[in-house]
Amino acid sequence: MKSHSHSPLDSSTAHRQSAVLGWALKGILVLLLSYAIGWVLEQYQWATYQFPQTVLWCSVPYAITSYWLYNGAYLPQFEERRFLLVATAAPYLAAPLGFALLQQPYSRGAVLLVYLLSAAWFTLGHWRERGRYALSLAYLDSSVPMRLKELLGDASELSQQDIKLRPLAIPAASDAAPKVTDDTSALAGVVIDPQAPTDAVRERLISDLRLQHVRLYSVEAVAELISGRKMLSNLQAQDLWALDGNPAYDTVKRLTDIGLTLAALPLWLPLCLAAGLAVKLNTPGPMLFSQIRIGRNGREFRIWKLRSMRHEEATTARFAQPNDDRVTSVGKIIRRTRLDELPQLWNVLKGDMSLIGPRPEQAEFVRVFAHRIPAYPYRHLVRPGLTGWAQVQQGYAEGEEQTAVKLSYDLYYVAHYSLALDLLIAYKTARILFTGFGAR
């Protein structure tokens, strides 16, 4: 389920979705091959009758993988391989739980076989599609390279992601009826600069490209695809007005939040109590720390955390710093491992927060940032979360400049939040828990 806001990359997304769907349908041969292997193994009594039956059941995780890859076709270029890993592995890792709930006997070997074959199939499809279309762009306006550098802050991001950008071959200016002479069949699209001056010749070239069914992208759209951020410096009012959320997915997301939080209760509640006891024994003061934060639709709510600072310092509204002297010895550990966030699962159950979304900010800071950064309030269109796109991409933000960068990630999430993006964030959060990235 994808956001309903209209993206300037809709045509690219549609192309990638079409490619995923076609490749997934061809991949049914993978299931047939797995079934044939299982049948042969059963005939020679090298496997039980459960093997081919399990292969048939594995059409469910195969379909889930296909749907997730289809749903994630709009994700930033640099996240494609990570999401491919998540989308191909997670359904098969969850398969034993599904068999247990259904009380259905199954073959672990069959699950492993179908997973390996389907993962190889979708990986092959990814590299095939990427080699054919994904990385070759031409630009019509000479200002495009400079604009990309301004928006991204580092032109090397193009080369780091193997994105080829070259000028579009155009006819001589004396041609009364100019036509594009470039071989556009090998291009993923043509980039134009909406701020570039226009004339009759440029308009005819653009119309010629459209008649050839060439995809046209604004320079801002390409920057967004590369960086996974909304470009605040070029964000127009109508772009913000289009951020209308994703009501259908909101319901699924809320039910998932409640279900996962309750299912994990036997794990996180004892862990929270143990960490809280360590906080209490380490320094004088309460176990918990609360603060007013701003949530969905700008509503205030009280957030709960395990106290990680000295009690007399904890209520001060200021950004945490590297090696902050207010943080206790136990506080450093629970911050690095994110254990201090566990009480917020109560906020998730209450509906103040979601498991995934922009991090809720202190009310004092929100008032300041909303005054200085006009687009800031739009991050409150969705529920705040325990972890979010800005957290896994940027880490902790301090000061107005880093907050603006954080906002660009948050607005990207608001515009595109979906099951695919939430799965990617969950995967990256799990990795971060082992590294301590972004902890202060």
What are these regions (language model features)?
Residues 1-128:
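Signature of alpha-helical transmembrane segments in polytopic membrane proteins
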Residues 2-10, 377-440:
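C-terminal terminal-structure detector
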Residues 2-31, 122-266:
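N-terminal hydrophobic signal-anchor/signal peptide
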Residues 116-132, 331-337, 346:
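Hydrophobic alpha-helical transmembrane segments and immediately flanking/interface helices
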Residues 212, 284, 309, 372, ...:
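Phosphate/oxyanion-binding loops and surfaces in catalytic or ligand/nucleic-acid-binding neighborhoods
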Residues 223-224, 229-231, 288-329, 386-406:
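Short, glycine-rich, amphipathic interfacial segments at transmembrane boundaries or analogous
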Residues 249-313, 347, 419, 424-440:
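A hydrophobic, helix-centered structural microdomain
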Residues 322-383, 425-433:
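A short, structured surface patch at a secondary-structure boundary
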